[in-house]
From Swiss-Prot:
<comment type="pathway">
    <text>Amino-acid biosynthesis; glycine biosynthesis; glycine from L-serine: step 1/1.</text>
</comment>
<comment type="subunit">
    <text>Homodimer.</text>
</comment>
<dbReference type="GO" id="GO:0035999">
    <property type="term" value="P:tetrahydrofolate interconversion"/>
</dbReference>
<dbReference type="Pfam" id="PF00464">
    <property type="entry name" value="SHMT"/>
</dbReference>
<feature type="modified residue" description="N6-(pyridoxal phosphate)lysine">
    <location>
        <position position="229"/>
    </location>
</feature>
<comment type="pathway">
    <text>One-carbon metabolism; tetrahydrofolate interconversion.</text>
</comment>
<dbReference type="GO" id="GO:0005829">
    <property type="term" value="C:cytosol"/>
</dbReference>
<dbReference type="InterPro" id="IPR019798">
    <property type="entry name" value="Ser_HO-MeTrfase_PLP_BS"/>
</dbReference>
<comment type="similarity">
    <text>Belongs to the SHMT family.</text>
</comment>
<protein>
    <recommendedName>
        <fullName>Serine hydroxymethyltransferase</fullName>
        <ecNumber>2.1.2.1</ecNumber>
    </recommendedName>
</protein>
<dbReference type="InterPro" id="IPR015421">
    <property type="entry name" value="PyrdxlP-dep_Trfase_major"/>
</dbReference>
<keyword id="KW-0028">Amino-acid biosynthesis</keyword>
<keyword id="KW-0663">Pyridoxal phosphate</keyword>
<dbReference type="InterPro" id="IPR015422">
    <property type="entry name" value="PyrdxlP-dep_Trfase_small"/>
</dbReference>
<feature type="binding site">
    <location>
        <begin position="125"/>
        <end position="127"/>
    </location>
    <ligand>
        <name>(6S)-5,6,7,8-tetrahydrofolate</name>
    </ligand>
</feature>
<dbReference type="InterPro" id="IPR039429">
    <property type="entry name" value="SHMT-like_dom"/>
</dbReference>
<dbReference type="GO" id="GO:0004372">
    <property type="term" value="F:glycine hydroxymethyltransferase activity"/>
</dbReference>
């Protein structure tokens, strides 16, 4: 029999110490990685519940195990809330990750050797959209589209490629693209060439739920997403689809890719979907965009750095560091030493290797969750530029660390 007195700190102090150290890092550093966010206490409570004990292969009302009457309620809540949030015909909340959701789409609609078309990873796409080392690039014939001279999606070239190659699937979505995507235009060309139109909205899902970014659901055959990032839920994946594709997608997830779903994570997803339907969440997403725009403006117009695509229309943007003679890898490290967390990122036509890069990616979701507004966003942008202007100056790094500490103390992630 278990005892509530057997806390993690008591049972495994070594692991507890590592978790506490990570908690301090999250509180004491400004998080600007665009794919990261902080979840609510309610989301964590659901994910840490006894639902982790239950096996539930199958779907609500059709399980391969007994005793699923309560997890059926949990999963159906998540499904219904998700469909309502995005206006979808059908939804699957079981994918353990965005990558597995993407694999399910490929399994449902294509066979190895078929042609798929997605955005080039080198120009802002995602590795699961056809990167050569990923399953999507190894199993399928990949045609990649990219950006034009303005560093915006080259829709005309994309359409020409689609007509030439007639892919089985056309993918819209990105991991490092700051602008709005014209999903309606993608849908038109997909219909013209007879392709399944799939949108990966992982980065933009929270903005879409709040109405601040175009909703792909009315236009796409299938839409995938993670549940973290801007959606501010637990780490996991989801799939939205038109009614006629529900059976194919559900079969691809189970039994195609996964066995028993993680019902404790699905419960946490359900909480996040409920939170995302509130006015407070809409206000949050409005602030996310405002903060990103302020940082891009300050870094670009006031501090002389080049912003890829010239602006942001979302939560994220890329900074070209070549004028500072510093690589993305070096910038990530030195900013990290100043307690500002970013990630190195390739820029279009990057001369550096992918693990070095000429740029960094900056995102505003996590900093906005802790309460930062345009005032703090402007301060943070100047702190970033100060570090990039003098990456070897210990006094500058110490001063910036101090300023970061003051901001973090004023805006704790998890207050009382």
């Amino acid at each position: 029999m278990f005892s509530s007195q057997d806390t993690l700190a008591k049972v495994d102090p070594e692991l507890w110490s590592a978790i506490q150290a990570e908690n301090r890092r999250q509180e004491d550093h400004i998080e600007l990685i665009a794919s990261e966010n902080y979840v609510s206490h309610a989301v964590m409570e659901a994910q840490g519940s006894q639902l982790t004990n239950k096996y539930a292969e199958g779907y609500p009302g059709k399980r391969y195990y007994g005793g699923c009457e309560h997890v059926d309620v949990v999963e159906q809540l998540a499904i219904d809330r998700l469909k309502k949030l995005f206006g979808a015909d059908a939804a699957n909340v079981q994918p353990n990750s965005g990558s597995q959701a993407n694999q399910a789409v490929l399994m449902a609609f294509a066979k190895p050797g078929d042609t798929i078309m997605g955005m080039s990873l080198a120009e802002g796409g995602h590795l699961t959209h056809g990167m050569p080392l990923n399953m999507s690039g190894k199993w399928f014939n990949v045609v990649a589209y990219g950006l034009d001279e303005k560093e915006e999606i080259n829709y005309a070239a994309m359409e020409a490629l689609a007509r030439e190659h007639k892919p089985k699937i056309i993918i819209a979505g990105a991991s490092a693209y700051a602008l709005r995507i014209d999903f309606e235009r993608f849908a038109r060309i997909a219909r013209e060439v007879g392709a399944i139109f799939w949108v990966d909205m992982a980065h933009y899902a929270g903005l879409i739920a709040a109405g601040y970014y175009p909703n792909p659901v009315p236009h796409a055959d299938v839409v995938t997403s993670t549940t973290h990032k801007t959606l501010r839920g637990p780490r996991g994946g989801i799939i939205l689809m038109k009614a006629e594709h529900e059976k194919a997608i559900n079969s691809a997830i189970f039994p195609g890719l996964q066995g028993g779903p993680l019902e404790h994570v699905i419960a946490a997803k359900a909480v996040a979907f409920k939170e995302a339907a509130t006015p407070a969440f809409r206000d949050y997403q409005e602030q996310v965009i405002a903060n990103a725009r302020v940082m891009a403006r300050v870094l670009g117009e006031e501090r002389g750095l080049r912003i890829v695509s010239g602006r942001t229309e979302s939560h994220v943007f890329l900074v070209d560091l070549r004028s500072k003679n510093i690589t993305g890898k070096e910038a990530e490290a030195v900013l990290g030493s100043a307690h500002i967390t970013v990630n190195k990122n390739s820029i279009p036509n990057d001369p550096q290797k992918p693990f070095v890069t000429s740029g960094i990616r900056i995102g505003s979701p996590a900093m906005t969750t802790r309460g930062f507004t345009e005032i703090e966003a402007e301060q943070i942008a100047h702190l970033i530029a100060d570090v990039l202007d003098a990456p070897q100056d210990a006094a500058v790094l110490e001063r910036v660390r101090g300023k970061v500490g003051e901001l973090c103390a004023k805006f704790p992630v998890y207050g009382s």
